[in-house]
Amino acid sequence: MEDLEEENFSLSVSSPKDAEFDNVVGHLEDIIMDDEFQLLQHGFMDKHYHEFEDTEENKLTYTTIFNEYIGLVEKYIEEQLLQRIPAFDMSAFTSSLQCHREEIAGDIFDILLTFTDFLAFKEMFLDYKAEKEGRTVDLGCGLVVTSLMSSSISSS
């Protein structure tokens, strides 16, 4: 008779706080991927990207744009989360972010970071500006595939 290998499956039990956090992140993913959010964010960036320059100096207008962005985008996300999770508390969620930093997908964390980190916000605008002005790197451009096999095999 064949020996059957036994597999141990362990059930991961998370705390109610962790489950709540995971629930919020799931909803955040849905909100951020939604066309309405994408239009809101890109519309805002289209309106202001020309103001940003890739220099060490930060213009005073950046602060105004940053505050307007927070007022618009963070408010939108918070309203969407409150519709989905009536007891949602943005400040409690924001404070728990650092504990769960490694668990959050990059795109979501980057967007959340733009609410609190001015440099992340500025970098987002500079990347957007480079894309709009066609200054992004196209890694597929100029690649050539060459066969390592000789096209003609000589017979002896």
UniProtKB/Swiss-Prot annotation:
Q: Which Gene3D superfamilies match?
A: ADP-ribosylation factor-like 2-binding protein, domain
Gene Ontology BP annotations: maintenance of protein location in nucleus
Record's subcellular location: Cytoplasm; Mitochondrion intermembrane space; Cytoplasm, Cytoskeleton, Microtubule organizing center, Centrosome; Nucleus
Per the UniProt record, one Pfam family is ARL2_Bind_BART
Does Nucleotidyltransferase count among this protein's keywords?
no
Keywords for the protein's UniProt record, in alphabetical order: Cell projection, Cilium, Cytoplasm, Cytoskeleton, Mitochondrion, Nucleus
InterPro entries to which the protein is assigned, alphabetical: ARL2BP (IPR038849), BART_dom (IPR023379), BART_sf (IPR042541)
Query: Major place of localization?
Result: cytoplasm
Provide the transmembrane region boundaries: none
Q: What does this chain do? A: Plays a role as an effector of the ADP-ribosylation factor-like protein 2, ARL2.
* Protein name as annotated: ADP-ribosylation factor-like protein 2-binding protein
Q: Which organism is it from?
A: Xenopus laevis (African clawed frog)
